[in-house]
Amino acid sequence: MDIRARTKIIDIYSNLKYKKPLKSFQKILTTSDSDNCEDFFNIGLNIDKNKITAIGFDGDGCIISTIATELSIKAIENKTINQAKKILSDLIATYKDKNSANQVVEELKLLIEMNVTEKRLQCLLLTPSNLLQWFKNF
C-alpha cells in the first residue's frame, strides 16, 4: 500500500463521520463473525420506501474493520436496498477474486488498495458481509 493510501486511511480513521449514537435509528443490526474476531459494530438504519435514508454505526474494531464499516456505510447511504446489495456484493466478489469483472464504487476503492492478508480479510469484510446478509433477508 502506498503512502497516499496510508495517509487517507489515517485521515478517515481520525475523522469518522458515521460513528454516532444510534438512538434515532429505526433498525439496528449487530455485526457478528464466527471466528475469534472481537470486533463488533451496531449499524443503525432508517429505511423509507426501500431506500436507506440514514445510516450510522457504533462499536469497536481494529482500524481495518472500522475503515471498512465507515466506507461501506458511506457507499450505501441514500441507495435502495437492491443498489446496496449490488455495491456490497461487488466489493466482496472483487476482494475474493482480484480478477473479477465487478465494478467497485469509488467510495470503496480504498478497501481494495488496502490489500489485506487472508487473516485480516475477515476484518475488512465483517460489516459488508453482515449488511449484505441482512439486506438479502430484508
UniProtKB/Swiss-Prot annotation:
Organism, as annotated: Mycoplasma genitalium (strain ATCC 33530 / DSM 19775 / NCTC 10195 / G37) (Mycoplasmoides genitalium)
UniProt-recorded Gene Ontology molecular function terms: iron ion binding; iron-sulfur cluster binding
A Pfam family matched in the record: NifU_N
Domain of life of the native organism: Bacteria
One of the GO biological process terms: iron-sulfur cluster assembly
Protein name (Swiss-Prot/TrEMBL): Uncharacterized protein MG337
InterPro entries from the UniProt entry: NIF_FeS_clus_asmbl_NifU_N (IPR002871)
CDD domains, per the entry: IscU_like
